[in-house]
């Protein structure tokens, strides 16, 4: 009798299961807009500070995290750099109202961002970017 041992492969989530997304911004109105835009497509959790986001991130798995750059009590870029170290498959998106070349360079080199979005962000662009990020997360997990 020939018995083959096989390792269980990590499967992609079922098609009906929404991908988990964490959105961090200190502006309640933007959190509300982002959540309303993304909720039909994703399981959205919001945080209004870096400290709150760090707590949430360690309690739940997320495929994608979206962070505002400048927030009181911490900045989104530093948060995303730490998140990359702890959760390398999780895709990171930085949203900001301004762009400085050195910040763009740091975001690419240190945080390995999936995308860098300038405010104002259109709802269609936001949804598309998060969908693409969630797909890349799944491919990254499957690839090991």
Residue locations for each model-derived region?
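Alpha4 helix (beta4-alpha4-beta5 surface) of REC/receiver domains from two-component response regulators
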Residues: 78, 99-116
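The feature encodes the CheY-like receiver
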Residues: 31, 72-73, 96
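Acidic, metal-coordinating helix/loop segments flanking the phosphotransfer/catalytic sites
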Residues: 46-64
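Two-component/phosphorelay signaling modules centered on CheY-like receiver
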Residues: 28-46
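C-terminal output helix
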Residues: 121-130, 134, 138
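The short loop immediately C-terminal to the conserved phospho-acceptor aspartate in CheY-like receiver
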Residues: 27, 69-70
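Short amphipathic alpha-helix used as the core "switch/output" element in two-component signaling
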Residues: 55, 77-89
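Acidic catalytic/metal-coordinating carboxylates
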Residues: 48-49, 75-78
